[in-house]
Amino acid sequence: MKQYRNFVDGKWVESSKTFQDVTPIDGSVVAVVHEADRDLVDAAVKAGHRALEGEWGRTTAAQRVDWLRRIANEMERRQQDFLDAEMADTGKPLSMAATIDIPRGIANFRNFADILATAPVDSHRLDLPDGAYALNYAARKPLGVVGVISPWNLPLLLLTWKVAPALACGNAVVVKPSEDTPGTATLLAEVMEAVGIPPGVFNLVHGFGPNSAGEFISQHPDISAITFTGESKTGSTIMRAAAEGVKPVSFELGGKNAAVIFADCDFEKMLDGMMRALFLNSGQVCLCSERVYVERPIFDRFCVALAERIKALKVDWPHETDTQMGPLISSKHRDKVLSYFELARQEGATFLAGGGVPRFGDERDNGAWVEPTVIAGLSDDARVVREEIFGPICHVTPFDSESEVIRRANDTRYGLAATIWTTNLSRAHRVSELMRVGISWVNTWFLRDLRTPFGGAGLSGIGREGGMHSLNFYSELTNVCVRIDKESPDV
């Protein structure tokens, strides 16, 4: 049986307390995971500070660029190991893990290496009345030891999205992956060891949230900043702990994202895009659309076409190359999603597709599978329409005017993303800017330029990451002002 240990101060550390890593494909045990206690988290934080006081704290930006590229190269060399671990932990199809999760996880290190290598220096010249002048420039410095708490839906991608810029800025990190997906984080620690990164720069601690590693990190007085992706409720708990220490936080939380489909859209292109927006990763992407607004003239056509597409969607073994949807992350999460299927029935929804659990007649029946599901007929104040479900389910409803759909789409406590489908260029710009979200896609979905800002409004998060926005979060700027006299004093 595989053992996933903690990695602290450059050493692999076992724990007296362990838990099981279970695959959602068939409910079998993948590995035994060693849970970090408070003392081990404290040791990780101290190791991070020692690294900052030693060799790592003296690295230049150019040296850190080289480190990030070496990490990416070693990850690429072990790409198959990362694929196997990611698919075992999550059950996501090979078609997704091999084209999105693992390549993007590697690309995050290369991308932030490139950004750091070309990052502009904020500098200004101020001319003074006596003929002298002042030169001001911003010196970028690390925050210190950053607590990184990452989610289970895109485990490697979102972990490296945080770790790469944190290291680029010269920080040390204490990483806690989700208890549901410890595999690729452990492999990343192996990569750090293989490339020889100084002890204490990258520390990995396994565990849960309350009364475990997540809480120990968020409450630690010597953690300099916290970055978290996950549920809004957990984010609120972490924020309260961070507020007591007055430390920076970056949160990417939940979403109840809207798709707005106008009658003038390219219908087939829209259908292709919406199948991804609804069911990629079994709907377990914070950017997935759970509320779909369709202009009335094409509403019936859309419902029929979507139901037909779902019938053809292949829900099968993740390692099959043509599988399009796998299981949910866990039996616990499957039960949550199924409870919303039942709530939809109680609230009077019409099921256009799905609504149950697929039966395979083999060991997969012990896994965490649900059917891709589409419902209709609910009011905008129904709980199923307002609460984040985070599964392969959406509610479709018609609308009659642009102003109506903007109002309805914005009627939510969340504000992460929206996708808009129209061939009217003016409408595309107009509606996109009126959506109260962090990102609006037009005639596409999940198309990401890693240099651009990413984050949400309302309950969907605090702050922006991506490109220079990430470097600005993970560093402090000191303005250096130097007066240059007009003449040398010895002239």
Swiss-Prot record:
<keyword id="KW-0058">Aromatic hydrocarbons catabolism</keyword>
<dbReference type="Pfam" id="PF00171">
    <property type="entry name" value="Aldedh"/>
</dbReference>
<dbReference type="InterPro" id="IPR016163">
    <property type="entry name" value="Ald_DH_C"/>
</dbReference>
<dbReference type="InterPro" id="IPR015590">
    <property type="entry name" value="Aldehyde_DH_dom"/>
</dbReference>
<comment type="function">
    <text>Involved in the modified meta-cleavage pathway for 2-aminophenol catabolism. The enzyme is also active toward 2-hydroxymuconic 6-semialdehyde, acetaldehyde, propionaldehyde, and butyraldehyde.</text>
</comment>
<protein>
    <recommendedName>
        <fullName>2-aminomuconic 6-semialdehyde dehydrogenase</fullName>
        <ecNumber>1.2.1.32</ecNumber>
    </recommendedName>
</protein>
<dbReference type="InterPro" id="IPR016161">
    <property type="entry name" value="Ald_DH/histidinol_DH"/>
</dbReference>
<comment type="similarity">
    <text>Belongs to the aldehyde dehydrogenase family.</text>
</comment>
<comment type="subunit">
    <text>Homotrimer.</text>
</comment>
<dbReference type="GO" id="GO:0047102">
    <property type="term" value="F:aminomuconate-semialdehyde dehydrogenase activity"/>
</dbReference>
<dbReference type="GO" id="GO:0009056">
    <property type="term" value="P:catabolic process"/>
</dbReference>
<keyword id="KW-0560">Oxidoreductase</keyword>
<dbReference type="InterPro" id="IPR029510">
    <property type="entry name" value="Ald_DH_CS_GLU"/>
</dbReference>
<dbReference type="InterPro" id="IPR017628">
    <property type="entry name" value="OHmuconic_semiald_DH"/>
</dbReference>
<feature type="active site">
    <location>
        <position position="252"/>
    </location>
</feature>
<feature type="active site">
    <location>
        <position position="286"/>
    </location>
</feature>
<dbReference type="InterPro" id="IPR016160">
    <property type="entry name" value="Ald_DH_CS_CYS"/>
</dbReference>
<dbReference type="InterPro" id="IPR016162">
    <property type="entry name" value="Ald_DH_N"/>
</dbReference>
<keyword id="KW-0520">NAD</keyword>
